[in-house]
Amino acid sequence: MSLYINIKDTIYANLAKAALEAQKAGELSFESLPNYVLEEPREKQHGDWATNLAMVLTKQARKAPRDIATILIKHLDTEGTFITASEIAGPGFINFRLDPNWLTGVIPEVLNLEADYGKVNLGQGKKVQVEFVSANPTGLLHMGNARGAALGDSLAALLAMAGYEVSREFYINDAGNQIYNFALSLEARYLQLMGQDVPFPEGGYHGEDLIDTVKGLIEKVGNKYLNVDQDLRREFLVRYALEEKLTSIRETLTDMGVHYDCWFSEQSLHDSGFVKDTMEKLEQQGYIYEKEGAQWLKSTLFGDEKDEVVVRGNGTPTYFAADIAYHRNKFERGFDRVINIWGADHHGHVARMKGAMSALGYDPENLQIILMQLVRLIQNGEVVRMSKRSGQYITLRELMDEVGKDAARFFFIMRDPDSTVEFDLDLAKAESSDNPVYYVQYAHARLCSILRQAAEQGYNTAGIPQEGELKRLQSNEERELLKKIAELPNEIEVAARLTEPHRLARYVLDLAGLFHSFYNSQRVLVDEEGLREARLGLVRSTKQVLANVLGILGVTAPERM
C-alpha cells in the first residue's frame, strides 16, 4: 500500500474509531456511520485533509455539526500517526494538518517501485473486458473511431494498473446488411472498372478508398471474376476487401499504439448457431413474441420506447440479435465486468442491451457502456469537415500524419467522454507551453537533461537519498511537487473506480506544471551534497511518475526534445 493511501486510510480508521468511542461514552448517538468524505482542501491554509463526518452525522446525533466535531476531536487518537493538528472549520468541517516530514517517504517509495509506482489492488484480479473502436470493416477509421481508440486503450491500461485482469477486444462487424451492401458496392465498382456500364447500388459505399481497393484487386486477378456466378464473385470480393480493410485498421491502430487481445468475428456467432440459440433462450423466457411474421423482443419491459425486431420475416436475425448474442458470449467467457465504448448516437441502445442481459440471467450492472460525444477538428479557427486529400471525412491515418500519434492520443483523452472534443490542429503541432502534450513531454525531456548533466559532472544519479537529506526539501515548490507525486496511487484508484482516464491527463498536466515551477525557482546541481542528493531524488521521482502516467495514456516520454 502506498504511503499516501496508508495515511488516508489511517485518518479514516481513526475517525471511525473516535465516533465509536464517543458513542460508547454516551456523547454521540447514531445507528451507523453514514458515508462521509475525506479529501484535500482546495485552500492550502485549511490543512492537508478535511472531512465532513460531523456534518453528515447531525441528523442521527441530533447535535450541531461543530459540537459533533468537538466531540470527535476529543476522542481522536493521533499517536503514532503523521497528524499534528485537528481543527474545526466553517460549519463543522474537521481539518487535519500533517507533519511535513511525511513526504520524505515518497521519494524512496517511487525509486524502489519504479514502473510499479501507482499500482493499486482495486480490481483484486477480477476479469474485465474493454471493447472499443469495433469500426465497420467497410472503410477507414474516422475521428469517432480515433477518440474511441485513445479512450479505450487508456482505460484498459488504467484498469490493469488498478489490479484488474484486462482484455482488449475489437468486434468485427462482418455479417448482416452492411456486408451485403458492401458486396454490391464492390461488385459495381469491379464491373465498372472492367468497362461495364452498371448502376451503383442505392445505399452503397461511395468512398474513394473502396475504388482503390478494387483497383488493387484487378491488378492481381484481372477479369477472372467477370464472367462467373454472381454469388461466387461477391463472396470473393467481400473476402478480399474485408481482409484488406482489416489489415489497414490493424496497422493504423498499431501505429497509434493500440493493441488488442482478441478480434472477434460477428459472423462466427451466426456460423456456430449461437445467435439462434440466444434467441431461443429469450423465447423460452417469454421475452420474444411473433408479429407480422417477424420475432420481436419485449424491449419496452426494459424502458425502450418500442419493442425491437430480432428476427426478420425472412428468418434472418437483425444486428441487434447478433449483438445480444455477442454480449451473452462475453459473459459466458467468464468476464466479471464488460465495458463497451460507443458513440453517443447509440444511447438508445443502452437500456435494451442491459435489459436483454438481465433477461438472460446476467447482472446488468456488470455491463457498463461509456458513450462518447463527437469530435470537431479546428484549423485556423474554423471547423474542418473534409480531407483535402480525398474530399471525404478525415481519417485517423491523416490525423496522425498531420500531428503525430502522441498529440492525437493526448488531445482525445483530455476531455470527459461526455464532452465534445474540439481538436485544434494548429495547437497540436505547436512547440510551445500552450500545447498540452508538448508541455508534458518537455517536462520529461528537461528532467532527463538534468540527470545527464549530473552524470557528466560525476554526481550520483542511482542511489536513494537518506532521510536526513530528504528533509532538506523544504521550499513550497518542492513540497507541492512531492505531494502531487504522492497522490498518484490514490488518483489511479479514483480514476479506475470512476472509469475516467481523462483524470490522469489532468494529473500529468498539473505535475508538469509543478515541476516547471520547481525548475524555475530551485537549482538542482548545487554544491551542497545533501541538498543536491535530495533534489536529484526528486527529479528522478518526478521523471518516473511522468513516464508511468504517460505510459497509461499511450504517450511517449521523450528523453530529448
UniProtKB/Swiss-Prot annotation:
Reactions mediated catalytically: tRNA(Arg) + L-arginine + ATP = L-arginyl-tRNA(Arg) + AMP + diphosphate
**InterPro entries xref list:** aa-tRNA-synth_I_CS (IPR001412), Arg-tRNA-ligase (IPR001278), Arg-tRNA-synth_N (IPR005148), Arg-tRNA-synth_N_sf (IPR036695), ArgRS_core (IPR035684), DALR_anticod-bd (IPR008909), Rossmann-like_a/b/a_fold (IPR014729), tRNAsynth_Ia_anticodon-bd (IPR009080)
Which keywords fit this entry according to its UniProt record? Answer: Aminoacyl-tRNA synthetase, ATP-binding, Cytoplasm, Ligase, Nucleotide-binding, Protein biosynthesis
- Which EC class, in a word? ligase
Entry superkingdom: Bacteria
Where is the protein found, in the record's own terms? Answer: Cytoplasm
Q: Which NCBIfam families match?
A: argS
Its assembly, as annotated, is: Monomer.
Family per record: Belongs to the class-I aminoacyl-tRNA synthetase family.
Under which name does UniProt file this protein?
A: Arginine--tRNA ligase
Native organism is Desulfitobacterium hafniense (strain Y51)
- Gene that encodes the chain: argS
